[in-house]
Regions:
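Active-site entrance/lid segments in N-terminal catalytic domains of soluble metabolic enzymes
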Residues: 1-160
Length: 160
């Protein structure tokens, strides 16, 4: 009889169930969905889109409110070139979320994060570097890159 395990995906000598879910979008690939797939030995993706907002909603942090307050004067401005992400806040939100999810994994599957490179705004390289390395520092199993592979992505993670 053919079963799901008959179609195992082997990566680096380890078999995974051919269950692969997740991707882009703010918390569409929720931790609960990802953990269910990982528990079955599959490969799951979380999204790193708007993790400061996700952190605010899940953990009661105030990253989004702080950013809105800091740049309130630019709210109606056409030129938002002075608006930057607080990289310490980006790092803290990413580490908080990923660490929380990774503490609940079983080790049967993989938990990846999908990093949407085009989400960056001003100071894009610094923002991308912070997001990539914070996810790795928090223990994510791997990173997938979408919405445009940044040519510097691997260099940005070279110390990790």
């Amino acid at each position: 009889m053919t079963s799901l395990s008959s179609y195992a995906l082997t990566l680096r000598g380890r078999d995974y169930s051919p269950l692969i879910v997740g991707g882009m979008g703010t918390n569409i690939s929720t931790a609960e969905l990802g953990l269910a797939v990982e528990k079955l030995g599959g490969i799951s993706h979380l999204s790193d889109a708007m993790l400061m907002d996700v952190s605010d909603r899940l953990f009661g942090t105030r990253f989004t409110a702080a950013k809105a307050k800091r740049y309130a004067g630019l709210r109606d401005a056409a030129d938002k070139s002075a608006e930057l992400f607080d990289l310490d806040a980006v790092r803290e939100a990413t580490i908080r979320y990923i660490s929380n999810v990774m503490s609940k994994t079983t080790g049967r599957g993989l938990m990846l994060i999908n990093c949407m490179e085009k989400l960056t705004m001003n100071s894009g390289l610094d923002t991308l570097k912070t997001r990539l390395n914070a996810a790795l520092d928090a223990g994510i199993d791997g990173i997938t890159l979408s919405a445009g592979l940044h040519l510097s992505s691997f260099r940005l993670m070279s110390e990790n």
